[in-house]
């Protein structure tokens, strides 16, 4: 069953730098939300608060209605998958070993059947790819392995921290398509960090624009594009439109 995720008045600092300044956000079960904004706006800090990679100075985080600090780490890993920017694969482990890591950490054994299912779901045939090492894969294939690992214990929510940003256009499209298939099949809750509004429009139901540790505006892509609440939101969409126009004219 997909999870609800909720942040209540989160505040966090790195030294004198404010990363989150009273952020509140409720994410419905089964929905897909994209966090967008410039580097340093607080996107990754907010995302990592939901799986306790970061413990905020103040405020509350609720996962499935329960305080996140009341959930055992093993159970939290079993319920929430995480895909970092560079995949985070162990280079000297095979694809199968990398994907099996989460089932082992969450007490589900070696999870052979779950590993096979997860690889098939991201269109990587276990018999062909299972014994390969990360360096033998393309960038898109590595990110698909990372996605399979995040889902190998049938997680109810997935956090993605700019997982496709470093990929070339073809690999990114392949990774997007794999993610869409997986989400359609599993129905988990999604929280995605991205700089790319086009990616947010493709993969998310709602967009949250962040700036200087605060939420500038939240809503559907269409609503934000048609009625930006601030000049900053308007500028983000203007830049995205200009980039699209330049590409079309090239």
Each PLM stretch: what is its role?
Residues 59, 212-213:
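Conserved ABC ATPase "signature" C-loop
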Residues 36-38:
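The feature captures the beta-strand-to-loop junction immediately N-terminal to the Walker
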Residues 67-81, 105, 224-228:
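ABC ATPase NBD coupling module
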Residues 15, 71-73, 93, 97-112, ...:
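ABC-type ATPase nucleotide-binding domains, specifically the catalytic core motifs of the NBD
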Residues 133-137, 141:
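Conserved ABC ATPase signature
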Residues 218-219, 227:
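ABC ATPase "signature
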Residues 51:
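Helix-to-loop junction immediately C-terminal to a conserved catalytic motif
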């Amino acid at each position: 069953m997909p999870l609800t995720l909720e942040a209540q008045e989160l505040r966090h600092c790195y030294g004198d730098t404010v990363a989150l300044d009273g952020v509140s956000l409720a994410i419905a079960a089964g929905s897909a939300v994209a966090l967008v904004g410039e580097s340093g706006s607080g996107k990754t800090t907010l995302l990592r608060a939901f799986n306790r990679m970061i413990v905020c100075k103040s405020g509350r985080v609720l996962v499935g209605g329960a305080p996140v600090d009341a959930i055992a780490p093993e159970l939290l890993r079993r319920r929430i998958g995480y895909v970092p920017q560079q995949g985070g694969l162990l280079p000297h482990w095979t694809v199968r070993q990398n994907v099996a890591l989460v089932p082992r950490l969450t007490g589900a054994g070696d999870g052979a059947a779950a590993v096979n299912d997860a690889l098939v779901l991201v269109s990587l045939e276990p018999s062909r790819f299972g014994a390969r090492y990360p360096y033998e894969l393309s960038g898109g294939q590595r990110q698909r392995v990372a996605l399979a690992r995040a889902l190998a214990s049938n997680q109810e929510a997935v956090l993605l921290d700019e997982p496709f940003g470093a990929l070339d256009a073809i690999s990114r499209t392949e990774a997007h398509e794999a993610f869409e298939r997986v989400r359609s099949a599993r129905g988990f809750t999604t929280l995605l960090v991205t700089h790319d509004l086009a990616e947010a429009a493709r993969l998310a139901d709602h967009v949250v624009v962040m700036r200087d540790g605060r939420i500038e505006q939240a809503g559907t892509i269409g609503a934000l594009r048609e009625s930006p609440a601030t000049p900053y939101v308007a500028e983000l969409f203007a830049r995205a439109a200009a980039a699209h126009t330049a590409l079309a004219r090239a």
